[in-house]
């Protein structure tokens, strides 16, 4: 009777410089959804301001440094706006951390220099004009280097288009309004604000899907490179 022996196999190739990305992706996804929820909440308050109508005393910011006392609804809008800002900061911290990991992993997988230097992971969000394309470019470059030959998911472009639209028509790239100015805009013309909030919510949801798609593609590539086939005979 012959004995069955295990034939030793060569160890799987090791990819050096990889960073764990699954936990960062999960936290980033939840942070994006939390930020989207914040924009939903602020949209509700903007509708409440619009339906209530501007008080007879006029807008909160009456010009020349004069501000009238806020009513209870306006005070609560300030609080909601503050909470939205907090969720955006949390989202930014997790998102940038995820971007760093995905970018570093793409370099380890491809052994090629990234298209954008590391400082663009931060500055790409805040420099005028550059912030219209560089953050998306960093992610797209990391995806293409991680899975060469695979088409960039459409959700990457959809997420970025919604983000830029939401920032442009609301409070960001064009408007730098205080909460009091936003209250005034809600009283007199709420629709641009609501379009902005809707776009930001959609950007949060598509961003969640984008993070999952990019992370899944990268982890799949890593798994294919590090798998150890077993042969028995």
Where do the protein language model's features map onto the residues?
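Membrane-interface transmembrane-helix boundary segments in multi-pass integral membrane proteins
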Residues: 188-198
């Amino acid at each position: 009777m012959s004995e069955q022996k295990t034939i030793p196999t060569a160890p799987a190739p090791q990819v050096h410089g990889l960073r764990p990305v699954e936990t960062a992706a999960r936290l980033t996804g939840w942070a994006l959804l939390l930020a989207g929820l914040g924009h939903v909440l602020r949209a509700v308050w903007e509708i409440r301001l619009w339906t209530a109508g501007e008080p007879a005393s006029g807008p909160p910011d009456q010009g020349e440094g004069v501000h009238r006392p806020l009513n209870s609804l306006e005070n609560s809008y300030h609080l909601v706006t503050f909470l939205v800002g907090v969720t955006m900061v949390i989202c930014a911290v997790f998102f940038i951390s995820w971007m760093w990991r995905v970018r570093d992993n793409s370099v380890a997988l491809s052994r090629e220099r990234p298209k954008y230097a590391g400082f663009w992971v931060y500055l790409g969000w805040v420099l005028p004009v550059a912030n219209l394309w560089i953050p998306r470019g960093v992610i797209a470059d990391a995806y293409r280097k991680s899975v060469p030959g695979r088409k960039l998911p459409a959700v990457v472009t959809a997420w970025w288009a919604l983000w830029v639209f939401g920032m442009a028509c609301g409070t960001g790239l064009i408007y730098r309004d205080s909460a009091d100015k936003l209250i005034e805009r809600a009283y007199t013309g709420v629709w641009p604000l609501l379009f902005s909030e809707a776009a930001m919510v959609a950007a949060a949801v598509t961003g969640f899907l984008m993070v999952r798609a990019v992370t899944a593609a990268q982890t799949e590539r890593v798994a294919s490179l590090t798998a150890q086939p077993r042969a028995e005979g």
